[in-house]
Amino acid sequence: MRDSFHRQITYLRLSLTDKCNLKCGYCWTSFQHDCPAGSAENGRLGEFTSFGYAERLMSVRAAAKVGISKVRLTGGEPLCYSGLVDFIADVKRVPGIEGVFLTTNGTMLADKAADLKGAGLDGINISLDTLNRDKYKRLTGFDMFDKAMGGIQAALSSGFGKVKVNVVLIGGFNDDEIGDFVNLTRDEPLDVRFIELMPMTGSPLFGKEAYLSGRVVLERCPDLKSVGMDDPSSVARLYALGGAKGRVGLIEPVFSSFCDKCNRLRITYDGYVKPCLHSSDEYSLVGKSEVEMERTIRNAIDAKPREHGDLRCLRTDIDGVTTGGRSMRRIGG
């Protein structure tokens, strides 16, 4: 289905839970942990909402009927969701769904990567913002750096064709590690993707002084050469070092907006369709039949704005961007 600006909407980001076993400063708007001691078991408490397993699967079927073909499962931390493996297998069976992907912090991935692959998961994005153990603990609140690195290796060993490492660029925190991240691509078939920080209103740690343009990566690593994009709807411009097994991606929502080719919708963990990340507009799927969900999703697609309202402000004043009153963990990363 096309929206009112003729963009083909094919990509659904579906949040399974708002719980997470880490506590990264740019994702949270308060300092209260809801998964003490990094526990995945505690995170599972978040599943018991009025929008559960059956409703989420129904929403995928409804979305597929309007043209969604790619689903990315997010959180919170989706590996906190105890039904994840079965859910992936069920989504893969939905007619029209061609790919199912996962975004995770990787800390619980080592023991689950093989099962996820067996369920039909097509690719994994792993969020990792530093290669320094002390900084990792400072950012996330937990000393789980080794588990995150083990998750990356488990994903590679399990045969996933697409393993991506997402790095949020944070001025004064990890910009001294850009070269180290780029070097990860030399010997491993990883896509390391640098993402511009979009400071969210209410984020306790990072303001406009932390923003860095993705172009700083090219300035620090002049040996990177452009290799284009994976497809026209991709948000990452890709580069590579000569002879490297992997690639480097730049995702620049501030410096180089991609609203004009946005092909995605989000469904929050509690059952609301968000046509735009930075819009307060939400469309409830709670308590609806599959037919009603399909109608609601169509309405949300029709309501997608040309670009998010904060975009112009971002380019001139990086004080903070609204997400419709929700922190990122309550929307879906």
Where are these regions (language model features)?
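A short, compositionally biased micro-patch
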Residues: 17-19, 119, 268
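Radical SAM/AdoMet-radical enzyme domain recognition
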Residues: 50-73, 77-195
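Canonical Radical SAM [4Fe-4S] cluster-binding loop centered on the CxxxCxxC motif
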Residues: 4-52
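Auxiliary Fe-S-binding modules of radical SAM enzymes
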Residues: 1-10, 187, 197-333
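Short, flexible helix/strand-to-coil boundary loops that buttress conserved ligand/catalytic motifs
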Residues: 28, 113, 140, 277, ...
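Residue-level signature of catalytic and energy-coupling elements of molecular machines
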Residues: 16, 192, 271
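A short acidic, helix-capping loop that chelates divalent metal ions and anchors anionic groups
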Residues: 35-37, 132-139, 201-205, 284
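Glycine-centered loop/turn positions within well-structured domains
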Residues: 22, 133-134, 257, 283
